[in-house]
A protein has these predicted regions:
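Bacterial N-terminal signal peptides that target proteins for export
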Residues: 1-10
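C-terminal motif of bacterial Sec signal peptides marking the signal peptidase cleavage site
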Residues: 18-22
Length: 140
């Protein structure tokens, strides 16, 4: 019984420690530096080439928006998860009212800007997500 209690206490401590190093506390980049190297074109944004690559580098990470963690109930690991799994995340052809855009711009009643801390997306990437949604949020 003592061993079981000790293991339970140790695992609880480990979980607490891991939660401190999770998505909300990633401040590894300098202010203004993007967590991704993806550069979006001004038009004809590709989900596969631009959007999902950006998400893989900046959002769909362990303890953030991957399939295992799905912080805030959102996984950004696939087109379906991004566009259809959570209503309102992407409002096709309406970036202004898409929760995804509100979150990356840090506006509206949606809570903190994402990615958190110093890991904000740069303006090109934010504009690229807006353009992708305005162009119909295609799976291309």
């Amino acid at each position: 019984m003592k061993l079981l209690l000790a293991l339970l206490a140790a695992s609880t401590s480990l979980i607490g420690l891991l939660s401190l190093t999770g998505c909300k506390d990633k401040n590894t980049l300098a202010p203004g530096e993007s967590p991704s190297t993806v550069v979006f074109p001004d038009r004809n944004v590709s989900y596969g080439v631009h959007v999902q690559t950006l998400f893989n580098q900046a959002c769909a990470l362990p303890m953030c928006h991957d399939d295992g963690s799905h912080a805030g109930g959102l996984s950004l690991t696939s087109y379906y998860n991004t566009v259809f799994a959570v209503p309102g995340i992407v409002v096709i052809k309406d970036p202004q009212n898409s929760i995804l855009v509100m979150k990356i711009e840090g506006r509206g009643p949606t809570g903190d800007r994402m990615p958190p801390g110093a890991n904000a997306l740069n303006q090109n990437q934010i504009n690229g997500i807006r353009t992708w949604i305005a162009e119909g949020a295609q799976n291309n």
